[in-house]
Amino acid sequence: MNITIALPKGALLKGTIARLQAIGIDFGEFLEGSNRLLRLEDRSGRYEGLLVRAQDVPVYVAYGQAQVGIVGFDVLKEKQLPVAQVADLGFGYCRMSVAVKSDSPYRSVQDLPAHCRVASKFTTCARSYFEERELPVELIPLYGSVELAPLTGMAEAIVDLVSTGRTLKDNGLVELEKIFDSTARLIAHPLSYRLGRVGLHELLGQIRTAAVPA
C-alpha cells in the first residue's frame, strides 16, 4: 500500500525535497521550472507526493488524503487541525512577530491603543496572542503585502512571518515583539499514526533522522 506525502509549495519545498532525497525518495521533479504536475510517484512505487499550498498540507493530512506531511509550525498554529505532530525538522526558520511603522510612538505591544486595527494573514494566531494579553484589537484579514497596512493607515500594526527582517526594514517597519518561532514540522494522519499503518513509523523515523547535506 502506497504512503502519500504532502509537500508544501513555497519556501519549505526545497528543504523538504532534500530531506526526502536523503532517504531515497525523490520528488525533485517538483522543483523543475517546467513542472506542472501536482502528483508524483517515486521510483520505488511505494510513495506518492502531493504538491499543495503550505496552508493545505495539514488539511490533506487531517482528512487522510496524505498520511505524512511537512509544513511550517506557523501553519499548524493557524489551522489548528487534528494531526499528529511527529518532529521538529529544524529547517525553514522564521518567526511570527508584531510589527509597526518605525516612526510610530509604539515601543511595546502594551503601547498599542485599545481596539486598534491589526492586519494579518494569520488571524487565528493574532487573535490568540492578543486575547492572552487581554488587549482588545480589531483584526483585519489580508492575504498579501500585509506590510502595506500600516503604511496606508489601514492598521496600526501587523502580525506576520519574519525571516531576515529585510522586508520590514525596506518598508519602514520594525518588530515590536516575537510571538513564536517557526520551523518545518513532520506531521502524520492521526489514525494511521496511532494504529501503526504498515511502513509509516519506519518512514517517519527515517525522515526525522535523515542526514541532509549542508
Curated annotation (Swiss-Prot):
Molecular function GO labels: ATP binding; ATP phosphoribosyltransferase activity
Any single GO CC term annotated in Swiss-Prot or TrEMBL for this entry: cytoplasm
Domain of life: Bacteria
Single biological process term from Gene Ontology: L-histidine biosynthetic process
InterPro entries: ATP_PRibTrfase_cat (IPR013820), ATP_PRibTrfase_CS (IPR018198), ATP_PRibTrfase_HisG (IPR001348), ATP_PRibTrfase_HisG_short (IPR024893)
Catalytic activity: 1-(5-phospho-beta-D-ribosyl)-ATP + diphosphate = 5-phospho-alpha-D-ribose 1-diphosphate + ATP
UniProt keywords, alphabetically: Amino-acid biosynthesis, ATP-binding, Cytoplasm, Glycosyltransferase, Histidine biosynthesis, Nucleotide-binding, Transferase
Cell location: Cytoplasm
Predominant subcellular localization, coarse grouping: cytoplasm
Protein's pathway: Amino-acid biosynthesis; L-histidine biosynthesis; L-histidine from 5-phospho-alpha-D-ribose 1-diphosphate: step 1/9
Coiled-coil residues: none
HAMAP family: HisG_Short (MF_01018)
Protein purpose: Catalyzes the condensation of ATP and 5-phosphoribose 1-diphosphate to form N'-(5'-phosphoribosyl)-ATP (PR-ATP). Has a crucial role in the pathway because the rate of histidine biosynthesis seems to be controlled primarily by regulation of HisG enzymatic activity.
Family statement drawn from the similarity comment of this UniProt entry: Belongs to the ATP phosphoribosyltransferase family. Short subfamily.
Assembly and interaction partners: Heteromultimer composed of HisG and HisZ subunits.
Domain notes: Lacks the C-terminal regulatory region which is replaced by HisZ.
Protein name as catalogued: ATP phosphoribosyltransferase
Gene that this polypeptide is encoded by: hisG
